[in-house]
């Protein structure tokens, strides 16, 4: 899915923000013309990366690092002390991603205990989700806004605070 999304993104520069548009104008459709860059289409191709010798950079959609291809990459790399794992974005409580950024020394992946020797980094500024102000702006542009919102995403305190904010600022049931 990420490969397809990347292809769509590369063919729609009119949707880029100012910074990305400047890069596109500089490099054109060669924006990702990086030597040895490979996209994997199947889970099997992705797992084969772990069998390749030598150093590598694996970019994977991690989500909360609880399911999918990322588990194979973590299982095969967390124990390497010369490995670094960069987790981009928020990680919910109770998830593998949260345990890693909080410094767990061992995790269970696919039934196997894996020692964490890799360096773990968290880049908090990345998110595929709109923030509170972006959601309020989106709501403000609706021609016929709904009579009520159901806030179902996020940890309880943040979701509850956002629901209160919706009610206070917009007079909308949430």
Placement of each model-derived feature along the sequence:
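Acidic/His-rich, metal-assisted hydrolase cores and their charged scaffolds
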Residues: 1-174
């Amino acid at each position: 899915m990420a490969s397809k999304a990347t292809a769509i993104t590369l063919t729609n520069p009119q949707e880029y923000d100012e910074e990305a548009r400047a890069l596109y104008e500089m490099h054109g459709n060669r924006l990702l013309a990086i030597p040895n860059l490979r996209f994997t289409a199947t889970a099997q191709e992705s797992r084969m990366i772990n069998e390749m010798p030598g150093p590598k950079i694996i970019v994977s959609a991690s989500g909360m690092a609880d399911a999918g291809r990322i588990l194979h990459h973590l299982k095969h790399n967390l124990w390497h002390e010369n490995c670094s794992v960069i987790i981009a974005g928020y990680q919910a409580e109770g998830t593998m991603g949260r345990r890693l950024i909080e410094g767990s020394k061992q995790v269970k992946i696919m039934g196997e205990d894996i020692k964490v020797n890799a360096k773990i980094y968290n880049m908090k500024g990345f998110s595929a989700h709109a923030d509170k102000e972006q959601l309020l702006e989106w709501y403000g542009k609706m021609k016929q806004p709904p009579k009520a919102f159901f806030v179902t995403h996020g940890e309880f305190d943040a979701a509850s605070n956002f629901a209160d904010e919706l009610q206070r600022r917009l007079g909308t049931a949430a």
